[in-house]
Amino acid sequence: MDKVIQELKELEVGKVLENEPLSNHTTIKIGGPADVLVIPKDIQAVKDTMKVVKKHGVKWTAIGRGSNLLVLDEGIRGVVIKLGQGLDHMEIDGEQVTVGGGYSVVRLATGISKKGLSGLEFAAGIPGSVGGAVYMNAGAHGSDISKVLVKALILFEDGTIEWLTNEEMAFSYRTSILQNKRPGICLEAVLQLEQKERDQIVAQMQKNKDYRKETQPVSNPCAGSIFRNPLPEHAGRLVEEAGLKGHQIGGAKVSEMHGNFIVNAGGATAKDVLDLIAFIQKTIKEKYDIDMHTEVEIIGEKR
């Protein structure tokens, strides 16, 4: 790994951190160390990093802003690439927006609303990066990324980079082709929006933000929604009806505000969260005969 670190630093790809605690890079403030964490300064730096990784046959993992993510306590071996400030560009051309995978979804939604561009009102208050939103087809309030994405620049597992159209992304509820059939990460996205009355867009976004603040634990460290909604049921409602709000294992606690959120109540480990998830799944299965599948991405070394 020393040679990998040396080459990455020589190429000046951006920040290169050794044995970096990933709890510093996740919204739930949980996660063991990455052998090496690279925060690339631009897309070329991502390409250069991948060349080094492939040359040495080192395992690699990519993360965004750390929302909707649970990193296990043992951390992640190999190189972790964090898409952040180096990939946070945005260009507007009429009703089309090109945006980097590291760009904040909240910042994007707010910025385009001020330009009178509609299509991302649903994203008001959604934490995380554009790359992560594309990866999991993030959504709320009856809409999602698939409704506005034209194409996405994807870095695949084998290190190749290519554009995929909306159709090729094979979007469905909180899912894209990147999660299983063609594992990869989004470096850049092109979105098709619609010019509308600015005041109406801003008002709708504020309404969505207020709803999120009133119903979700935005002030506590959490990873976002833990479970996918087992349609037509809602995960949070099932957890609440089962009397599990406030249930705690170790430092992990089911939010008192919303049943589909687990918060870090202090000193929580990934094991605490996993044990709590398993307890919820078992309880819901026994009470309602419904299987609860996780929406949060769980990555890292298993003991």
From Swiss-Prot:
It catalyses: UDP-N-acetyl-alpha-D-muramate + NADP(+) = UDP-N-acetyl-3-O-(1-carboxyvinyl)-alpha-D-glucosamine + NADPH + H(+). Its main location: cytoplasm. Residues 29-196 form the FAD-binding PCMH-type domain. Disulfide bonds: none annotated. One of its GO terms (molecular function) is UDP-N-acetylmuramate dehydrogenase activity. Pathway: Cell wall biogenesis; peptidoglycan biosynthesis. The active site is at 174, 225 (proton donor), 295. Its cofactor is FAD. InterPro entries: FAD-bd_PCMH (IPR016166), FAD-bd_PCMH-like_sf (IPR036318), FAD-bd_PCMH_sub1 (IPR016167), FAD-bd_PCMH_sub2 (IPR016169), MurB (IPR003170), MurB_C (IPR011601), MurB_C_sf (IPR036635), Oxid_FAD_bind_N (IPR006094). Pfam families: FAD_binding_4, MurB_C. It comes from the Bacteria. One of its GO terms (cellular component) is cytosol. One of its GO terms (biological process) is regulation of cell shape. Its EC number is 1.3.1.98. Keywords: Cell cycle, Cell division, Cell shape, Cell wall biogenesis/degradation, Cytoplasm, FAD, Flavoprotein, NADP, Oxidoreductase, Peptidoglycan synthesis. Cell wall formation. PANTHER family: UDP-N-ACETYLENOLPYRUVOYLGLUCOSAMINE REDUCTASE (PTHR21071:SF5). Belongs to the MurB family. This is UDP-N-acetylenolpyruvoylglucosamine reductase.
